[in-house]
Swiss-Prot record:
Changing G795E: In dmi2-4/NN1/R38; loss of nodulation, but no effect on mycorrhizal infection. Autophosphorylated. GO terms for molecular function: ATP binding; protein kinase activity; protein serine kinase activity; protein serine/threonine kinase activity. The active site is at D722 (proton acceptor). The gene is NORK. This is Nodulation receptor kinase. InterPro entries: Kinase-like_dom_sf (IPR011009), Leu-rich_rpt (IPR001611), LRR_dom_sf (IPR032675), LRR_N_plant-typ (IPR013210), Malectin-like_Carb-bd_dom (IPR024788), Prot_kinase_dom (IPR000719), Protein_kinase_ATP_BS (IPR017441), Ser-Thr/Tyr_kinase_cat_dom (IPR001245). It comes from Medicago truncatula. Its main location: membrane. ATP binds at I602, G603, E604, G605, G606, F607, G608, S609, V610, K624.
């Protein structure tokens, strides 16, 4: 008897174990291919709602300093309480996720609310999926459907106005049917709706594909009727069909159902619409519920009957081209007994798949990065290498060219990156590489050889710790024109007779100047800088004591008063400051009262969040509160105050006051009622009223005068470092005021020991020479201002990856038209016919000069001011002349755009170094 009980218990245990194994296997099978990432999570965890396991993202990004906790008000429905915020000045950060080639996937990113009007872009591979713009206190989601082309996919965040951030990433396999007819496209989810339900969103485990079905109310003119039924014994054969939990509710109407989706992108896109049906009324038979389906009033399905195929459920996939809006309309067919019914629907926008970098180049550069990181952990340049090396933002030090539809790497510049170890031999497999610069590092082992088929034309190995002989395979490369390998202490330079006779530039392995040790540089630099600063300070004291208390800035025709009380201080070894005592200190309590406890957020800048406030005298102000993530201390803040308070000019936003209490660093400026130039050119304000050409020209001149004042600041030039249209503010009189000096620095002078400034700026405006060399000068501002001038002329953003690829960069798109004298092609359509051709040409040619790749060829801001003054005089004189013609009954001049060559010459207000009549090869300045 006892043995029988033991046998029964054993059988029960075995049955339980088998059931458990089957359940685990079933659950594992259901989530095969799922990737669930919780950014900045301390460890892996299981979400109690979905039972899915989320993995921390530390294997991609280990730096915990970029982690933030989501405010409690926002994370009630999220399993992950953290967010990763990438503090980058430009470029992208990507998550590399495993895929199976040719499998269709859904990828979803979840972004908690960060700040109002913050925006950045998201891409799948190098195909831009969309812009994320935060306008309400709620989470943002973006979802795309794609076919994997290899064994991984990059999910990338691209910086726009603010540092990008993310909380969760979810990758899920999907049925093939989703990409039917869109094989080479990425589908961006616009809407996925569960109709008639009033409960929470439905997702995994109810939906085995983990699609998230959100409840939606109808927008039909007359009330739609929710319909629900406890559905059972329904065979859902189609893999794209929603789960029964979604299909058991629906909306119906006796005559018509309509669902309106406004606010779509205004460019023409193809859309895929999935409509899902399940007949919930058991009394309805085939032929009794028949209706027509329209998309944007275009009939797509006539006399559609859910039950026609013999099944209770059905779905249909429809395609349509739309611009700005998409309406789904279901209309009862003639003779039908019942009105239309719809249980759920999905709308997806098709985006063309963009080819990534040449696969071989991609594999080589990724392997090279891995090898370099073995000896160079936490190297800033290598850590910034993320995603595709060429697209959308190229990696630092990499230059690419187009070749047969994909990008190839032609230049690799890793100079001055403090790299150690052996030079990765895999670099020799980059078959398209033409220029390789590895100078000024600490490499100690040379690669073995380059193949004879190499296209290399320039190689720089100088200033490293290489030893031995230069391989003959390098010396004899057929296309090599430049070779530098000097200043490697242990490398032989004796046998140079084998050098390729075709070499044009070489150092023959010799070191022209011995590289001084760091200690020597530091001591000599410190002594030189200290002596120079003391001399400058004493000189300025005597100069200001005897000089009349005002200065006149040449080219501006105006005298600007000096502060009556000034203080001289030497806060650092390489800067001196003139501090005005007119800036008012505010208490933190007063600031909180003026802003009503920081009630109205009006923007985000390089300094931090900006709030609107009102002082006791009624003056409206903009209050900038330094970001909590800033590492700036009290001393640095005081130095910045010294700079800001000393600058007084009608085209610069004045500093009214400051607060430095309880670790809070706050700056107070007057509020600019007309917003920024960006907003007036292509922001929300531009939709209300187009900025006319004379006003644009006046704004350009005002901004140029402000920058010229900074560059000619008494004693030492000040460089803005972040010139862009959003930093040019407009007061009530539309007078331009250059703003945001949080990044400003004094310019280097002769005698400075070295220049070591962190590269700052905004993508689309950044001077390529500054980015490459990290050597800052006034000409860096000039380049950025040239971009602003093109914005003013064209009304376009400096960088917009939503446009066709050839138009992503405003500068690269506009240059060919300007050089071909086809300026009309780039002019903002809103001002066409409303400008004088000669005035416009002056501005365009100044812009082109500003955008010279080499700073030597760019004009200074004072020259730019003179040219813009001339342009404004031409424009104003033409306007007055045409007004007199109009008063006599003549036609408006704006009906004709005059050809510039037919115009009489004008008298310049001052001799300028800018050539305005030709586009000949530039000369150094």
């Amino acid at each position: 008897m006892m043995e029988l009980q033991v046998i029964r218990i054993f059988r029960l245990v075995v049955a339980f174990v088998l059931c458990l194994c089957i359940f685990i296997r079933s659950a594992s099978s259901a989530t095969k291919g799922f990737e669930s990432i919780a950014c900045c999570a301390d460890s892996n965890y299981t979400d109690p709602k979905t039972t899915l396991t989320y993995t921390t993202d530390h294997i991609w990004f280990s730096d915990k300093r970029s982690c933030r906790q989501i405010p409690e008000i926002l994370f009630s429905h999220r399993s992950n309480k953290n967010v990763r915020k990438f503090e980058i000045y430009e470029g992208k950060r990507c998550y590399n996720l495993p895929t199976v080639k040719d499998q269709v996937y859904l990828i979803r990113g979840i972004f908690p609310f960060d700040s109002l009007n913050s925006s950045f872009y998201v891409s799948i591979g190098v195909t831009e999926l969309g812009e994320l713009r935060s306008s309400r206190l709620e989470d943002l989601e973006i979802e795309g459907v794609f076919r994997a082309t290899k064994d991984y996919i990059d999910f990338c965040l691209l910086k726009e106005d603010v540092n990008p951030f993310i909380s969760q990433i979810e990758l899920r396999p999907l049925p093939e049917e989703y990409l039917h007819g869109f094989g080479t496209s990425v589908l961006k989810l616009i809407s996925r709706n569960n109709l008639g339900d009033t409960n929470d969103d439905i997702r995994f485990p109810d939906d085995q594909n983990d699609r998230i079905w959100k409840r939606k109310e109808t927008s039909t003119p007359t009330s739609a009727l929710p319909l629900s039924f406890n559905v059972s014994n329904v065979d859902l054969k189609d893999s794209v069909t929603p789960p029964l939990q979604v299909l058991q509710t629906a909306l119906t109407h006796p005559e018509r159902l309509e669902f309106v989706h406004d606010g779509l992108e205004t460019d023409d896109y193809e859309y895929s619409v999935f409509l899902h049906f399940l007949e919930l009324n058991g009394t309805v038979r085939a032929g009794q519920r028949v209706f027509d389906i329209y998309l944007n009033n275009e009939i797509k399905k006539e006399k559609f009957d859910v039950l026609a195929g013999g099944s209770k459920n059905s779905y249909t996939a429809l395609n349509i081209s739309a611009n700005g809006s998409l309406n789904i309309t279901l209309v009862k067919a003639s003779g039908s007994e019942f009105g239309p019914l719809l249980n759920a629907y999905e709308i997806l926008q098709a985006r063309s798949w963009i080819e990534e970098t040449n696969q071989k180049d991609l594999e080589v550069i990724q392997k090279m990065r891995e090898e370099l990181l073995l000896h160079n952990q936490e190297n800033e340049a290598l850590e910034s290498w993320s995603g595709d090396p060429c697209m959308i933002f190229p990696w630092k030090g990499i230059t690419c060219d187009d070749s047969t539809g994909s990008s190839i790497i032609t230049k690799l510049d890793l100079s001055s990156n403090n790299l150690k170890g052996a030079i990765p031999s895999i670099v020799t497999k980059m078959t398209n590489l033409q220029i390789l610069n590895l100078s000024h590092n600490q490499f100690d082992m040379l690669f073995p050889s380059f193949p004879p088929s190499s296209l290399l034309i320039s190689l720089d190995l100088s200033y490293n710790d290489l030893s031995g002989w230069l391989p003959e395979s390098i010396i004899s490369l057929p296309h090599l024109k430049s070779l530098y390998f000097g200043c490697n202490p242990s490398m032989s330079d004796e046998d140079t007779t084998k050098l390729n006779s075709s070499l044009i530039n070489t150092d023959y392995g010799r070191c022209k100047a011995k590289k001084p040790k760091f200690g020597q540089v530091f001591v000599i630099g410190a002594i030189t800088s200290g002596s120079l600063l003391i001399t400058l300070a004493v000189g300025i004291l005597f100069f200001c004591r005897y000089r009349h208390k005002s200065i006149t800035l040449e080219g501006f025709g105006k005298t600007y008063p000096m502060a009556t009380n000034i203080i001289f201080s030497l806060p650092s070894k390489d800067d001196f400051f003139i501090k005005s005592v007119s800036v008012k200190p505010f208490t933190l309590e007063y600031i909180e009262q003026a802003t009503e406890q920081y009630k109205t957020l009006i923007g985000e800048g390089g300094f931090g969040s900006v709030y609107r406030g009102t002082l006791d005298d009624g003056q409206e102000v903009a209050v900038k509160v330094r970001s909590s993530t800033s590492t700036q201390g009290t001393r640095e803040f005081d130095n910045e105050l010294n700079l800001l308070s000393a600058i007084q000019h009608e085209n610069l936003v004045p500093l009214l006051g400051y607060c430095n209490e309880y670790d809070q660093q706050i700056l107070v400026y007057p509020f600019m009622s007309n917003g920024s130039l960006l907003d007036r050119l292509y922001g929300e304000a531009s939709k209300r009223k187009i900025l006319d050409w004379p006003t644009r020209l006046s704004i350009a001149l005002g901004a140029a005068r402000g920058l010229a004042y900074l560059h000619t600041f008494p004693g030492r030039s000040v460089i803005h470092r972040d010139v862009k249209s959003s930093n040019i503010l407009l007061d009530q009189s539309m007078c331009a005021k250059v703003a945001d000096f949080g990044f400003s620095k004094y310019a280097p002078q002769e005698g400075d020991s070295y220049v070591s400034l962190e590269v700052r700026g905004t993508a689309g405006y950044l001077d390529p020479e500054y980015y490459k060399t990290q050597q800052l000068s006034e000409k860096s501002d000039v380049f950025s201002f040239g971009v602003v001038l093109l914005e003013i002329v064209s009304g376009r953003e400096p960088l917009n990856i939503k446009r066709p690829r050839i138009e992503w960069s405003l500068v690269e798109w506009a240059k060919p038209y300007i050089r071909a004298s086809k300026v009309d092609e780039i002019v903002d359509p809103g001002i066409k016919g409303g400008y004088h051709a000669e005035a416009l040409w002056r501005v365009v040619e100044v812009a082109l000069q500003c955008l010279e790749p080499y700073s030597t060829y760019r004009p200074c801001m004072v020259d730019i001011v003179r040219e813009l003054e001339d342009a404004l005089i031409i424009e104003n004189n033409a306007s007055e002349y045409m007004k007199s013609i109009d008063s006599l009954g003549g036609s408006n001049r704006y009906s004709i755009v005059m050809d510039k060559r037919a115009l009489p010459s004008t008298t310049s207000t001052a001799e300028s170094t800018i050539t305005t009549q030709t586009l000949s090869h530039p000369q150094p300045r």
